[in-house]
Amino acid sequence: MVEPANTVGIPVNHIPLLKDELDIVIPTIRNLDFLEMWRPFLQPYHLIIVQDGDPSKTIAVPEGFDYELYNRNDINRILGPKASCISFKDSACRCFGYMVSKKKYIFTIDDDCFVAKDPSGKAVNALEQHIKNLLCPSTPFFFNTLYDPYREGADFVRGYPFSLREGVSTAVSHGLWLNIPDYDAPTQLVKPKERNTRYVDAVMTIPKGTLFPMCGMNLAFDRELIGPAMYFGLMGDGQPIGRYDDMWAGWCIKVICDHLGLGVKTGLPYIYHSKASNPFVNLKKEYKGIFWQEDIIPFFQSAKLTKEAVTVQQCYMELSKLVKEKLSPIDPYFDKLADAMVTWIEAWDELNPPTKA
């Protein structure tokens, strides 16, 4: 049995890394009591809370946190007609927080994620580990069998090309979860009591050309490097699919990172995922996606961007055209999704105009 860490008595970190360069984005429909546990690690940072569902409901935030809160009315007011690209009644709404942030880095976490313990019993400062991951280079072009070569006590193994040892900039840090695993509905139904108790003390770069299922509940990224591609798609209310929002974004960012020569890491840090979602509700949301992903994944595996695409926005616009061309025959939903991808980029550029040289 794995338990969350007890953070009572841990002092608030008064020398936090990247304090003025990082926002924490939290999507929620409920009071944020869980932040009390995270106070020692997250209180120094600015929070962007994206309230999903009923905008008239009041969300309580523990005292002492610096935050701004956006509900659906705010999203509609700020984006106008372009608000149609932001999902409703789905945690995909979190990507609105990425858009309104003005910081270089983003850490996003779900409200059912608690502080984990490492094998020694020490509370894991997930944000600190994400920052370390993002500030260290990645090695997507050649796999190092000792995993992260830049970590203390590790290095490049014999046979690793010296020409590749500088690595590349890291765009994304994908963390993992103890307790409730991030399973799809069929697996949840077959293994309802399964809990993840394995703490693997490793960080690795996902190799170029390899896709992965990105989970949005413990994720950090360099907004300046990859932000415009972190669109969690059209999911939830009024859409034929849900629970594919973070994975859609992950497939898009991986194709773009591979094209632009950026790195994506996975592994540490762990959080404690406290609550299993209802597998029957999940199955209804995922049902079409379970079949569609057998076409979606080969699409992303074969997606090729042109050499003219040199910015994230240009890459994303090319990808949206490919989605319309290749995936729309599967279902009209993909035509709508491709249009929403374009709207997302237009809205991003409106709120984040390019700086003039």
UniProtKB/Swiss-Prot annotation:
Keywords per UniProt: Acetylation, Cell wall biogenesis/degradation, Cytoplasm, Glycoprotein, Golgi apparatus, Isomerase
CC terms in the record's Gene Ontology section: cytosol; cytosolic ribosome; Golgi apparatus; Golgi stack; Golgi trans cisterna; plant-type cell wall; plant-type vacuole
Motif (DXD motif): 110-112
Requisite cofactors: Mn(2+); Mg(2+)
Molecular functions (GO terms): cellulose synthase (UDP-forming) activity; intramolecular transferase activity; structural constituent of ribosome; UDP-arabinopyranose mutase activity
Tissue specificity remark: Predominantly expressed in shoot and root apical meristems. Expressed in epidermal cells of leaves, inflorescence stems and seed coat. Expressed in pollen.
The protein's Enzyme Commission number: 5.4.99.30
Pfam families assigned to the protein according to its UniProt record, in alphabetical order: RGP
Modified residues (N-acetylvaline): 2
PTM (free text): Reversibly glycosylated in vitro by UDP-glucose, UDP-xylose and UDP-galactose, but not UDP-mannose.
Transmembrane regions: none
InterPro entries according to UniProt: Nucleotide-diphossugar_trans, RGP, RGP_fam
Reactions that this protein is recorded to catalyse: UDP-beta-L-arabinofuranose = UDP-beta-L-arabinopyranose
Protein family (similarity comment): Belongs to the RGP family.
UniProt subunit comment: Heteromers with RGP2, RGP3, RGP4 and RGP5.
Purpose of the protein: UDP-L-arabinose mutase involved in the biosynthesis of cell wall non-cellulosic polysaccharides. Catalyzes the interconvertion of UDP-L-arabinopyranose (UDP-Arap) and UDP-L-arabinofuranose (UDP-Araf) in vitro. Preferentially catalyzes the formation of UDP-Arap from UDP-Araf. At thermodynamic equilibrium in vitro the ratio of the pyranose form over the furanose form is 95:5. Is not active on other UDP-sugars (UDP-Gal, UDP-Xyl, UDP-Glc, GDP-Man and GDP-Fuc). Functions redundantly with RGP2 and is essential for proper cell walls and pollen development.
Domain notes: The conserved DXD motif is involved in enzyme activity.
Name recorded for this polypeptide: UDP-arabinopyranose mutase 1
Gene responsible for this protein: RGP1
